[in-house]
Design a protein with these regions (language model features):
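Residues forming the flavin
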Residues: 1-23, 30-481
Length: 481
């Protein structure tokens, strides 16, 4: 078993022990944890095969964005097992590629009565730091809010963060992300203006402002007066041979397994990327008892804060700048990787190859905003590399070119969690004020904007400031409609 029994910071509140079957074999897990986590805890890393070449596939993102975890569950194909809750008696099977069930021409006669649209003042999509703060702020302003979250747990990146936050007292400096998430969840539970829907995915934005969602395997239609999109971001990968082997994870997936599910991803890890995420997750891996063999960074210097790098160096972890991955290797799963040094022109230096044995490779090489809903709604989109890719054009209230839609958090540009919370507060406050004047709006708005600008000061915020300025001035690539 690969479950963590002890952690220096976290405690794992496991649900009821249940049994399920994988390929006919009976296994044990805990009710409510993801199917993929339960399989990992039982030593199952290969979840399905690729469609054409039948290559093994394993968990990568662990938040429902990629297709690496698709499996057949209780006979239903293409289930995202990284967000599918485990229940007693589930039947889990591998599948080859994306299953293509036969077209059921009689399905319409079995769908039952069409459901009425559910109306609300504000719909918030995503219950990470931005979405939670947006929902709370809109509800405080008097709006009726539906907050949807495709996973079972609230908090997004916050519940994965065991380190203490920087900033000022207003940004809860000195408080761990997991503790901040608990406080926000309590506020949501106690606010009668907020309906919380977990296990709910936004499927699309349709004509007349209707948002269709899948809630516990049932499709619902929501007609909100305002929509706040706080869908977060997805992790990038690098291109190198065998980058798809089971054991190659996004950094967020490793955090999800360790810090949410209490499951060890493996024994030995190579971390790719020395930004804040790579450095922080490396230290979290050490806390969980995983051996960090090296942190590999292509740039000539680390991109994260020195305070995070210093912790790793004190623990004896080598940080190899001007290095990258040549290739990974392994029979059906990761067994190691060869890295090499780069010259000043980012070209490989012959003879510098190093072979590192590891069963985990953790990719912390950047994030891109999740923006599909903005595209579907016809929002004006811009490509801003400093913000992670395509983002919606916004005014100071976080309002998009479609006046009823707002953006918050990493969906509008990848930043730190503290910034995401503030953009959520601005979006929630503005959406509520659009519907009915909020008492003290100007003072609150100015306060949140001021805090956000303060967080973006200094060398660490230069990239974000540049991206925001480009977006505001239109000095970026337009999305071709």
């Amino acid at each position: 078993m690969n479950r963590m029994e002890q952690h220096p910071i976290l405690t794992f509140d496991k649900g009821r022990k249940v049994t399920f079957t994988f390929e006919g074999k009976t296994l044990e897990g805990y009710e409510g944890e993801s199917v993929a986590a339960a399989l990992h805890a039982n030593g199952v890393r290969v979840l399905h095969e690729s469609e054409v070449k039948h290559r093994p596939r394993g968990l990568f993102c662990a938040i429902g964005n990629c297709s690496s975890c698709l499996m057949k569950v209780d006979g239903v194909p293409n289930v995202r097992t990284c967000v599918e809750p485990l229940r007693e008696g589930l039947r889990v099977e591998r599948q080859e590629g994306h299953a293509h069930p036969k077209l059921d021409v009689e399905i319409e006669s079995r769908l039952g009565e069409r459901r009425n649209l559910i109306e609300t003042d504000v719909l918030v999509v995503g219950a990470g730091p931005a979405g939670m703060c947006a929902a709370i702020e809109a509800a405080k302003g008097g709006a009726k809010v539906i907050l949807v979250e495709r996973g079972q747990k609230l908090g997004g990146q916050l519940v994965k963060q065991t380190h203490k936050f920087f900033g000022s007292e207003k940004q809860q400096a000195g408080t761990r992300g997991v503790t901040i998430a608990e406080g926000l969840e309590k506020e949501i539970a106690e606010n009668p203006n907020i309906q919380l829907w977990v296990n709910t995915s936004a499927l699309g934005y349709y004509a007349n402002g209707i948002v269709m969602v899948e809630r516990d395997h049932q499709v619902e239609g929501i007609l909100p007066k305002r929509v706040i999109v706080a869908t977060g971001a997805f992790e990038k990968n690098l291109v190198f041979p065998n980058n798809d082997l089971p054991g190659v994870y996004g950094a967020g997936a490793v955090q999800t397994l360790m810090n949410l599910e209490g499951v060890l991803p493996g024994k030995d890890v190579i971390m790719i990327g020395a930004g804040n995420i790579g450095l922080i997750v490396s230290y979290q891996l050490l806390q969980a008892g995983v051996n960090v063999k090296a942190v590999v960074e292509a740039a000539p210097r680390i991109g994260g804060y020195e305070v995070h790098a210093a912790k790793l160096r004190r623990a004896g972890v080598p940080i190899l700048t001007s290095h990258t991955v040549s290739y990974a290797y392994g029979e059906g799963k990761l067994e190691g990787a060869v890295i090499h040094q780069l010259d000043e022109k980012w070209q490989p230096i012959p003879g510098t190859e190093k072979d590192i044995k590891a069963d985990i490779m953790c990719m912390a090489v950047g994030l891109s905003p999740l923006v599909e809903l903005f595209f579907q709604a016809g929002c004006e989109m811009k490509f801003v590399p400093e913000l992670g890719g395509y983002v919606p054009a916004l005014d100071d209230c976080r309002r998009t070119s479609v006046g009823t839609i707002y953006a918050a958090g990493d969906a509008s540009g990848v930043e730190e969690a503290s910034s995401a919370m503030l953009t959520g507060k601005i979006a929630g406050l503005s959406a509520a004020n659009d519907l009915a004047a909020v008492d003290g709006f100007e003072e609150k708005f100015a306060d949140y904007r001021g805090q956000l600008q303060m967080l973006r000061q200094g060398p660490g915020g230069a990239k974000i400031r540049s991206g925001v300025e480009k977006l505001k001035e239109g000095k970026c690539v337009d999305y071709a409609k």
